[in-house]
Amino acid sequence: ALARWRSEGVVKELNGHKIFVHASGPESDDGVLIIHGYPGSSWDWQGVVEHIGDKARVVVSDMRGFGLSVKPLDGTYQSTYTLQLQADIYEAVARDAGLSSVLLVAHDMGQSVGLELMARQEEGRLPFRIRHAILTDGSTLVDMIQLAEMQKKLLAQPDVAATEDLDFNDFMEGLRPTFGTAFSASGDLDETLVAMAHQVFYDHGSRVQAQILRYLKERKEMFSRWSRTFFTFRSAPLTLLWGVEDPVAVIAMADRVKTERPYTDLYKLQGVAHWPSIEVPEYFADAVIARLDSV
């Protein structure tokens, strides 16, 4: 499945960065733009994309430093991996795909990138239109975050690329607790963890994981802007799909958004933890399909 996903996409030069882009479905200037999370990649969404099929144009790419996109080893976080830079690249992805309006889907770290794009729309400076936003399991409300042990270890490291790769098995096992009970019991978890780790370790990507994780510090710096957008976004409908068992982006975060913005649609996913697109891809895809006609 991983090899097929890679073969279906293409690495493009966007804003001067080599970015892996997977596009599917009928050609259209209206489509679904998906932003993945940390430490995932576009591959996390292959089940969702497959289930949507020919019902919509779907574009999902690997962020800089992730998956098959470029993973510079010679920069700092500020010069190479900021969420603002990632948002700029997603503008370029949409432009290159010919998208003028999108149903935006964003997860985890990508949730903050999505909120930056949403903030730009509210300010009238986004070059395409978000007509519906679906946000899922992410700790943009960083004052409520529950860091995983792997995250704590990586954050303690300096802002330079490591000289050696991380231990593959240790990294893989660090992801295991972030999956919910239903998926863990399905028999698919081990294969999924291997595929996810391969995406991280491709082209020495594990060496920049500690640098990229500094996005948590950027979230603190941008807390006012992105939380305000979360709570007051007016220019399109907002839907939250959230795993009840998420140990990092806890369900209380979704409850808080619902309290602050009561007209938000919130769907709590029982038995699901941090990776809804992997754990319940058909459910997630159906939620996207149901919102394709949003004005």
Spans of model-derived segments:
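Conserved hydrophobic "DFG−1" position in protein kinase catalytic cores
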Residues: 21-23
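Short beta-strand element of the alpha/beta-hydrolase
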Residues: 29-36
